[in-house]
Swiss-Prot record:
Keyword Cytoplasm: yes
Name of the protein this chain belongs to: Ribosome-binding factor A
GO cellular component, one term: cytosol
SUPFAM superfamilies: Ribosome-binding factor A, RbfA
GO molecular function: ribosomal small subunit binding
Length: 135
């Protein structure tokens, strides 16, 4: 059952973790020069079925010091234990504090590619042709 949908509890806890991580990143308390003045969006958090691992999908909205998006994710993973300790204050009701793993969110990039494909002249021509045939 690897492709099973997440439970209601996984979704609820994931959303709580997402808010807590986003709040920590928004405060700018990380002592990493790369992350200090950067805007990072926490797009989604997926919880493991036992709620012990939280995979945080992030999207850096601005990069400084000519850093790549992968560098930002690596820096977040390096500071994941500190972030875990900071979010523990707002998630006291949890029996176990989840291990945080940061991943790059590519959904916006995928959206841009699909949007560019739909706007291409070939697709527009086919759509226009299908509209005429349907009439």
């Amino acid at each position: 059952m690897k492709n099973a949908e997440p439970s209601q509890r996984q979704l609820r806890v994931g959303e709580q973790v997402r808010h807590a991580v986003a709040h920590i990143l928004q405060q700018g308390i990380l002592l990493d020069n790369l992350l200090k003045n950067m805007v990072i969006s926490v797009v989604e958090v997926r919880m493991s079925p036992d709620l012990k691992i939280a995979i945080c999908f992030v999207s850096p909205l601005s990069t400084v010091h000519n850093a790549s998006r992968a560098d930002v994710v690596n820096a977040l993973n390096k500071h994941s234990r500190f972030i875990r300790g900071e979010i523990s204050h707002s998630l006291r009701q949890m029996k176990y504090m989840p291990e945080l793993r940061f991943r790059l969110d590519n959904s916006f990039d995928n959206f841009s590619k699909i949007d560019a494909l739909l706007r291409s002249p070939e697709v527009a021509r086919d759509l226009h042709h299908n509209d005429k045939v349907g009439d």
